[in-house]
Swiss-Prot record:
Lineage, highest ranks first: Bacteria, Pseudomonadati, Pseudomonadota, Alphaproteobacteria, Hyphomicrobiales
Regions annotated as coiled coil: none
Keyword tags: ATP-binding, Ligase, Nucleotide-binding, Protein biosynthesis
Species of provenance: Rhizobium johnstonii (strain DSM 114642 / LMG 32736 / 3841) (Rhizobium leguminosarum bv. viciae)
EC primary class: ligase
Protein's recorded name: Glutamyl-tRNA(Gln) amidotransferase subunit A
Gene3D superfamilies with a match to the protein in the record: Amidase signature (AS) domain (3.90.1300.10)
NCBIfam families registered for this protein in UniProt: gatA
Protein family (similarity comment): Belongs to the amidase family. GatA subfamily.
Protein biosynthesis among keywords: yes
GO BP term (any one): translation
GO cellular component, one term: glutamyl-tRNA(Gln) amidotransferase complex
A Pfam family matched in the record: Amidase
Family matches, as HAMAP family: GatA (MF_00120)
Keyword tRNA processing recorded: no
Amino acid sequence: MSELTSLTIAEARQKLRAKEITAIELTEAYISAIDAANGRLNAYIKVTPDLARVMAKNSDERIAAGKAGELEGIPLGIKDLFATVGVHTQACSHILDGFEPRYESTVTQNLWDDGAVMLGKLNMDEFAMGSSNETSYYGPVINPWRAAGSNQQLVPGGSSGGSAAAVAAHLCAGATATDTGGSIRQPAAFTGTVGIKPTYGRCSRWGTVAFASSLDQAGPIARDVRDAAILLKSMASVDAKDTTSVDLPVPDYEAALGQSLKGMKIGIPNEYRVDGMPDEIETLWRQGIAWLKEAGAEIVDISLPHTKYALPAYYIVAPAEASSNLARYDGVRYGLRVDGKDIVDMYEKTRAAGFGKEVKRRIMIGTYVLSAGYYDAYYIRAQKVRTLIKRDFELAFDAGVDAILTPATPSSAFGVADENLAADPVKMYLNDIFTVTVNMAGLPGIAVPAGLDHKGLPLGLQLIGKPFDEETLFKTAHVIEQAAGRFTPAKWW
């Protein structure tokens, strides 16, 4: 890793403004790093070096003129779920072959308006459906981390695996990601990076390929808490084009870092102690509690009694919304088209060829739970459970809790093509056990690296906050980060 690519966003920002480095130099360093590493990691599916150089040149001109934006000259990777004008946007699916949008997503436009530079589009699970980044049409992403003494390839988590791997391997300064049931926080935990899923409505969904519209939310993956705070400030905005966007001012999240935790109450939910959870995860959780206690926070036990129903309810609601959202991909207007003897045959052949196995599975689950005779038994009941989950959190926060601390994942990163997980999709779905409640309740959640397991792989802790109180999450996560230190993989790629 070069000296330039090892800079955090905050460090690079300072050097760019002081004119110690140029945006062109920084961008070229990342382009070289991607060229050298992407063949092994498969984090990027489309690199845009020419566009990056033009954007970097423009940044240098604005810096020279004293008109630097908040992210001026900072090279970023963009998850392939965000529409980027004239640049490949496929949600890593065969069915969107060759699709290049004529418009820009609100989130990416916000970043460009603040001066960021686009390095390319990042790999992900197809249509964001997966927990390992193995469902991508472009093949799996490889985690930059390896277990001590092992050459086994590990997954980076999903669906934002490309984002997490690129950030961990220093192939971008930071990355955009999305989270429907844990797709920012789980990959962050698996790669020793920081990922925040903001409150539902904090970042616009306009121009972001939809998976489950009532659950999807964009957020950043970054190397540390400060960088995540810087990125979220630029990504977040109110947007008239997204009816779920909330009209609240975007705070200066970075200003929250370093604030005292004295007087804060941190809730510890007993329901997150699940059967089969490794002792290492429990030990890490206790360590996190101790760090926050030392920082002046009061630790209180809380109950979130409907947590056990969250995963089954999520895997009804999310596929139901996905089956509706993905009905639009039919080969008529854009993307893949497989010719048939008539229009119905063309639809069927296009969808059969265009969607991957996991996407088909979830479409079928969703169509089933929305069908006559099952709608009330499954979908309506799942929505009622969702209301109860949200109510559990409301009661905890009403009782004076400021944030909730839990593990981020039930394990560290597992192997690529794990036979046990491939044979039983439910085991793969259990990766989301600690994260789905946050999406079901529309709350903010952040994953922060907190230690290494016995194999030397990163483990993360999760903080859950009140609606639109990301500032509390950032300041609390910063305390954990300061106590735990930062974690970087040994370079093998």
